[in-house]
Amino acid sequence: MSQRLPQRIDLLAMADAGRTLEGRIEVTSLDRVLPLLHDTEGVLDVVMRMDRDPDGTRFVAGTIEGRIQLLCQRCLEPVVLPLNLAFRLGLVADQEEASRLTPRYEPLIVTAEPTRLADIVADEVLLAMPQVPVHPEQELSLIHI
């Protein structure tokens, strides 16, 4: 998977067309994640399928795979967080529509403006990150030998 993803897309049109995007996104494009990282090098593999379900709900379902490097708050050394994330987002226009969304989707409020793909990826990565990154106990003992 070496293809670069487009920066912005019309999610509603892509869902209506039943499109799938596969590619890589640079970690450096995840603006809200960058301040939380120890190292900003690397790429994440992303697959996003946009479609309508049998009820007519537009959605984005996908996966994000890769690794990010955080700072262990116990020893202040780098700690790698492997990412193997799956998500299902229902595309809605407002909070009222979001409240009617079935539980199988998390709401994503979209407008007529094209959506920045890096923002969707950043949201999912932020949700996967621990509040306090630390090495697992077995790794920590090896660091201090």
Regions found by a protein language model. Give the residues of each.
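Cys/His-coordinated zinc-binding microdomains
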Residues: 76
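Short Cys/His-rich "knuckle" micro-motifs
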Residues: 82-85
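Conserved small/polar residues in nucleotide/adenosyl-binding loops
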Residues: 143-145
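Short Fe-S-cluster ligation motifs
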Residues: 98-126
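Short, intrinsically disordered, charge-biased short linear motifs at domain edges
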Residues: 56-63, 123-135
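Cys/His/Pro-rich metal-binding microdomains
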Residues: 73, 141
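Cys/His-rich microdomains that often coordinate metals
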Residues: 79
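A positional/architectural concept
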Residues: 1-69
